[in-house]
Amino acid sequence: MRKEKLFHLLVLLGFTLLSMTISAQTDSRDVYGWLRYDDYNQDEYGICKFKTDAADDIQPVWPYDQARVACAGAFAEGFYYVYLYETDGYNATPYSFNRIDLSTGESTQVADYRGMPFLFQDMTYDYSTQTMYAIGYDESVYTTLLVKGNLTTGETTIAGKIGESKYVALACSYEGQVYAIDVDYGDLWSIDKFTGAA
């Protein structure tokens, strides 16, 4: 009797796991980003997308001029926001902060960033406070800064100093916790969005 109950329990568990797997497969979502480089086709540059269940199948959506390089971007309030810079092959110079309508591909410059003293490494949107955050390394003071950006004007304010380490990625949970990954070791850090402390 015990073996029979165990067998039925295992069969039930198997069907439950099977239904969860099938459900997970049907929940595929589109992920948008900015394609900076493609081994197969170096002419594809700009907004791209892929499915969560097929991340290796990247599809270009809206191509953009390769003279303007994106180094940070994030989706917020119905638009994709991107920080662009120019390069002469040796040096990178801040260029602009743009808003892109993903349904039409139309790009609108929000702010001219040519006077900005540093480049953003990444951006993320905090849905809990409706705030865009970015990280940038200021070479003049050897410090990574946590920056808040105004989506309407492009104006930036320093939220805090993270420290001397450089960071390459930034993310924010729906609850408002900011995270960054350092360049040197690939460690994930929790960032205080009010002080910048890691």
For the regions a language model picked out, list residue spans one by one.
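Short loop/turn segments that connect beta-strands within beta-propeller blades
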Residues: K51-A55, I100-G105, G149-G154, D192-A197
